[in-house]
Amino acid sequence: MANVNHSTLTDPYLHEPKGVATASAGSLYYADGSGSGAWNHAHHYVGGYVDFDSASPESQAITTTFSALDPTFALAENSGFTALSSPNARIRYDEPEAMIATLSFSTSIRHAAGGSRDVELALYQNGTIINGAHVIQTTGNSDWNNVTLVGQVELAQNDYIEVFAKASQSLTLETASAFLTIKGVFKP
């Protein structure tokens, strides 16, 4: 057998992985264990934020029933997601690969309703609460509180993530800042 180096092969003898000509940029080939495979992105991510402003914070009336928070999210870094404002603030996953995603939401909130109130925040996927991604914070009148939520879900194309809130009594919730991070890895 001849000793041939890849660097000396001419074009007709070069072999590209199956389907490379139609694979999207950044894709990796994942073998399915049956002699075939597919091109997929190894990961997707997004960071959505509400700029810090404690002098004129975002505000929203909330009640004793969960409703979606509706701040205006800007995107910091993004691969595979879209920030939407209708029907309310949400982040939608746009890619065809299934992902296992870790979610992290951090915010500074307060209210001026007088007295202490219990404020609950939860992460939702497609309008349903994510198990374990639900916290409660007792907030005092005009005191800023930092709240963090974490969760993990499987994301499919067009799934969306939202943040919902409710309180022990109706109040106006003010948000000085917020950051939502979604980091997804390919699920074979």
Positions of the model-derived regions?
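Extracellular repetitive beta-rich solenoid segments
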Residues: 2-45, 113-117, 126, 142-148, ...
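Surface-exposed loop/turn positions
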Residues: 27, 97, 157-159
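Terminal (often C-terminal
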Residues: 41-115, 135, 150, 171-188
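Solvent-exposed serine/threonine-rich low-complexity stretches and specific carbohydrate-binding patches
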Residues: 131-140
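Noncatalytic modules at the cell exterior or secretory-pathway interfaces
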Residues: 153-167
